[in-house]
Regions:
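Active-site neighborhoods and metal-handling regions in enzymes and metal-associated proteins
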Residues: 1-402
Length: 402
């Protein structure tokens, strides 16, 4: 009879070059293990894409299946689905245990095999669903559950030199995408065609710089006219017209790390009302970048940009907060909410944090200068200020195009 195991090892092929060195992953795990010890936890079950990637390098593709990274004082084990075969083991730091599809809940049987019963378990309350929490209790019968979401987020907010080096590459690749957009803009071109040109340029550059990586998720949002009113509006087939406001957004993804460039442009011509709004948003952007200093809170930076917009009678057109952290994140995983430029975030900026400044004004159709105006740069907080990592210029001098 054909064996139908609940879980097994697939060590297929040779382990790949990981995004970071073994010493980098060990340093991250050391901090996590210290956090577990401080909270009297014997094991962590990390289930989010961002935390698994952060602590071991493996970025999973769920497709409806659960994944985990189990960290104890002695072990680091990825729990992966059989559909992926040997790829998770090749792409992770530590060991990998694969569960089969022969019966439901083999994932939890594999977790139980590593952890056992009655332990103090750390988990991610902001990621593990209520249904999966119930299964955790059934299969592991933990003596206690401890939420690790906030502690792991705080750790990710502080970037290592190796992470900063990768983010620098990402910002440079985003600039390449920006120039590709600028060069592709012409009357009658569709948003989708311009976006594809920039995406292809970035993916080729990522492959050149990181020949041992896996390539996934790099994208471009390129919006025109009415479509610029929202920062996250999808690309469409709208064709560009003279005088259109444009929103350029390039997002290279490198080993699960997100970077971005965002700029306002106009097609061939800009009217005086639009130019006034554009210049005001650029001024707010420059003010905001100057406020990003060590020792200053996110709330204080936000208040400073708010005051500027209020003085210019524009605050009512603000769309969202003024910036956020960078690292292991994308539009569908990894938000670091403790490092966002919002009124209710009191986090104090410290050297090694990486954060954006990205003010946006949206004026609805019918008002003079209607459209969405946004500038976005990535900044590294340093000992004596900040360093802007994007180099593509902002403002009217370069960005009236086509």
């Amino acid at each position: 009879m054909t064996p139908r195991p609940e879980f097994y090892h697939i060590h297929n092929g040779e382990q790949a070059v990981l995004p970071f060195s073994d010493s980098e992953y060990e340093a991250r795990l050391e901090v996590l293990r210290a956090s577990l010890e401080a909270q009297d936890c014997s094991a962590a079950i990390l289930t989010s894409m961002h935390n698994i990637a952060y602590y071991c390098g493996f970025l999973y593709c769920a497709f409806g299946r659960p994944y985990a990274l189990i960290v104890t004082a002695q072990t680091t084990v990825v729990i992966s689905a059989g559909i992926d075969a040997g790829q998770p083991w090749r792409r992770c730091y530590g060991d990998c245990l694969t569960y089969s599809d022969w019966q439901r809940d083999n994932f939890w049987r594999a977790v139980h095999h590593v952890i056992g019963l009655g332990q103090e378990i750390g988990y991610e309350a902001d990621h593990l669903t209520m249904a999966q929490c119930a299964k955790l209790d059934v299969f592991l019968k933990p003596s206690r559950r401890v939420d690790l979401a906030a502690a792991t987020m705080r750790q990710r907010m502080q970037k290592s030199p190796a992470e900063i080096a990768l983010i620098r590459h990402g910002a440079q690749v985003a600039d390449i995408g920006g120039y590709a957009v600028r060069d592709a803009v012409q009357l009658g071109a569709r948003e989708i065609d311009i976006a594809m040109v920039a995406r292809d340029a970035m993916e080729a550059e990522i492959a050149r710089r990181f020949p041992d990586a896996e390539y996934r998720d790099t994208w471009v949002w390129f919006q025109s006219g009415i479509n610029t009113d929202g920062a996250h509006n999808p690309v469409t087939g709208r064709r560009l017209e003279r005088g259109d406001i444009l929103s350029l957004n390039t997002f290279p993804m490198i080993n699960g790390y997100y970077t971005a460039l965002e700029r306002t442009l106009f097609v061939q011509d800009v009217d005086k009302d639009s130019l006034r709004l554009w210049q005001a948003n650029v001024a707010a952007h420059e003010l905001g970048m100057g406020l990003l200093q060590p020792g200053v809170s996110c709330a204080a930076v936000t208040a400073g940009v708010n005051r500027f917009f209020e003085e210019h009678d524009l605050l009512q057109y603000r769309s969202f907060g003024y910036g956020h952290s960078f690292g292991v994140l994308s539009h569908y995983y990894g938000r670091e909410a403790g490092l966002e430029l919002r009124e209710d975030v009191e986090t104090v900026l410290t050297p090694g944090m990486v954060i954006s400044m990205e003010p946006m004004l949206t004026l609805p159709k019918g008002l003079p200068g209607a459209g969405g105006y946004r500038e976005h740069d990535i900044l590294l907080i340093t000992e004596d200020g900040n360093e802007r990592l994007n180099a593509y210029p902002y403002g009217p001098d370069l960005n009236i195009v086509g």
